[in-house]
């Protein structure tokens, strides 16, 4: 029994130290151009074969990391399920309010002390981060070419007493519409929430067509 406890403690400490050190590398988040079917996409860390930042937690944003926002996109940062940042202006930005401090940012002494405090916090979670930070990109371009139509003819009675008309007809309706996300914050809060990778318009089109 003692051996099992000791192994658990060693593993937790190793996980806490290793995970925290891996998360010290600054990230660069970006989102490739989204096609007309994608409404929301989770931000990806830019890595290459030469990158040393390959073991960090996917849901941790290190202090000082870069975040790029392209035209036609809106970016939000979600921490512990709550939106803490939103940006709809294109350009590159630096994340400097993270509660996951980096030894590569700010005052070296302060950052190191905060990092060791973070290691202590992770130890209480068995070596895991105990934190969730995500970057989401919203497609703010107009989503066009959405077709709709009545699945069955709609019966309709036409009556005109002046000419003695009283007939039953069947009416069909079809067309094309477009829409766009005008408030990404409300869309995240009320519609998509946290998504693993992408939220596509197929997930909402049925509801939209029903309301027609």
Give residue ranges: language-model regions.
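N-terminal hydrophobic membrane-entry segments
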Residues: 2-212
């Amino acid at each position: 029994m003692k051996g099992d406890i000791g192994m658990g403690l060693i593993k937790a400490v190793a996980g806490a130290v290793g995970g925290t050190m891996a998360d010290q590398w600054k990230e660069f988040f970006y989102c490739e151009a989204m096609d007309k079917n994608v409404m929301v996409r989770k931000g990806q860390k830019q890595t290459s074969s030469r990158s040393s930042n390959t073991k960090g937690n996917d849901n941790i944003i290190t202090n000082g990391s870069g975040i790029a926002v392209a035209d036609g996109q809106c970016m939000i940062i979600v921490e512990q399920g709550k939106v803490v940042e939103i940006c709809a202006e294109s350009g590159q930005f630096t994340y400097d309010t993270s509660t996951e401090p980096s030894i590569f940012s700010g005052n070296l002494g302060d950052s190191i002390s905060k990092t060791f405090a973070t290691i202590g916090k992770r130890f209480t979670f068995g070596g895991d981060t105990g934190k969730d930070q995500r970057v989401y990109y919203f497609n703010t371009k107009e989503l066009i070419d959405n077709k709709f139509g009545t699945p069955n003819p709609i019966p309709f009675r036409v009556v005109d007493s002046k000419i003695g008309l009283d007939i039953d007809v069947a009416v069909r309706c079809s067309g094309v519409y477009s829409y766009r996300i005008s408030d990404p914050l409300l869309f995240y809060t009320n519609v998509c929430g946290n998504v693993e990778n992408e939220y596509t318009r197929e997930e909402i089109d049925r509801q939209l067509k029903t309301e027609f």
